[in-house]
């Protein structure tokens, strides 16, 4: 009887607690990269929060969504990719250059899709502005300028979240933790995927911090890192 009880308890631990056990190791595994990302969020939270508040978005959820990107952010790599985007993307579009840029690692194609979807949504009228979505260098140059500042990326992040709530009304009925898991997956994988596809993608380990992925590269569930960040920030004061 005792042995059966122990086996049952161990089974429950593995089934229900595995995500907690493994997520608790993220801070140790990422080391200084985690600490630096955490410090960056803490130092900029006061500047970012008014932007998220403007769009009615929970800053804690927004910051958790992009936290994995802050962990693997590289100054020198971003400088090279940003320069390429500014030169090649502006003149030739996302088919010519579509590198992720900025602290939140946003691609021009992502911004294009957000611009277009925003313009077609009821939110554009509610907030009183639209984006220039013409297929020309002026529109692309303006888009790159928005992506080139942390404030601009915060606005794109907030708009992404509002559009996701609009597209998936039942998302708001989930717990905050579940919302983070869903939104982080959509942000990292494909924000235009269906509800079922995004739920399925939550299980995929595709996130890594290596410059180039090899067979030795360790991969993680992007959304679980976001959830860990959210829970840590929710349970402690900033």
Residue ranges and their predicted role:
Residues 9-17:
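Bacterial N-terminal signal peptides
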Residues 19-23:
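Sec/Tat signal peptide C-region and signal peptidase I cleavage site
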Residues 1-9:
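Bacterial N-terminal signal peptides that target proteins for export
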Residues 24-238:
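Catalytic glycan-binding domains that act on GlcNAc-containing polysaccharides
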């Amino acid at each position: 009887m005792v042995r059966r009880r122990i086996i049952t308890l161990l089974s429950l631990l593995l089934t229900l607690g595995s995500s907690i056990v493994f997520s608790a190791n993220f801070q140790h595994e990422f080391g200084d990269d985690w600490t630096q990302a955490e410090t960056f969020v803490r130092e900029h939270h006061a500047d970012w929060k008014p932007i998220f508040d403007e769009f009615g978005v929970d800053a804690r959820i927004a910051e958790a969504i992009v936290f994995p990107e802050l962990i693997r952010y590289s100054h020198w790599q971003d400088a090279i990719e940003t320069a390429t985007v500014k030169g090649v993307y502006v003149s030739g579009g996302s088919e010519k250059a579509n590198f992720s840029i900025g602290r939140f690692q946003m691609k021009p194609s992502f911004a294009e899709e957000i611009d277009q979807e925003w313009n077609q949504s009821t939110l554009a009228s509610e907030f009183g502005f639209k984006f220039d979505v013409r297929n020309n260098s002026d529109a692309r140059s303006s888009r790159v300028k928005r992506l080139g500042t942390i404030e601009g990326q915060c606005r794109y992040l907030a708009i992404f979240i509002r559009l996701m709530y609009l597209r998936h009304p039942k998302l708001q009925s989930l717990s905050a933790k579940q919302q983070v898991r869903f939104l982080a997956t959509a942000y990292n994988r494909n924000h235009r995927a269906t509800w079922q596809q995004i739920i399925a993608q939550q299980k995929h380990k595709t996130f890594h911090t290596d410059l180039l992925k090899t067979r030795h590269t360790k991969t993680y569930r992007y959304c679980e890192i976001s959830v860990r960040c959210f829970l840590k920030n929710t349970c402690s004061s900033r």
